[in-house]
Amino acid sequence: VVVASNRAACGVYEDRTGPLLVAALREWGFETPDPVVVPDGPPVGAAVADAIRAEVSVVLSTGGTGINPTDRTPDEVEPLLDRSLPGVAEAIRAYGIAQGVPTAALSRGVAGVAGRTLVVTLPGSTGGVRDGITVLADLVPHAVDQLAGGDHPGSMAPETPS
């Protein structure tokens, strides 16, 4: 879990979103360390890239997905993705809107796959994170299983020339 927040990284306040994501991942059966809190911008990309290199199953980030000039998380994360999963980010935005939060439409959150790692960027508000957790609860375990070769027999087999 990567938390993108200039203020939390500087100690102005304690982040409350990262622990929500860690708790959800642990509830879903993932061994998850405490959140990494970094300033907005390039440190977010570096933290996500480190997690991808470590070959973790899932990276969830919170913060930096809006339209504030310092919100750069999607710009840092998107180049790291091998494949985009636009439906995941769209589902999170749609859920927020359906819950009566029209500003959820302003989120630039992205989701995708880097190697065998699922990456999803979430808003920095506790409400946005809770919405994300609701949407991701069934998706994350299934996606991780698929990325590990499950659900499709033979998907781990090397390609053979035809």
Q: Which role fits each region the language model picked out?
A:
Residues 2-162:
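Non-catalytic beta/alpha edge segments that cap or flank active sites
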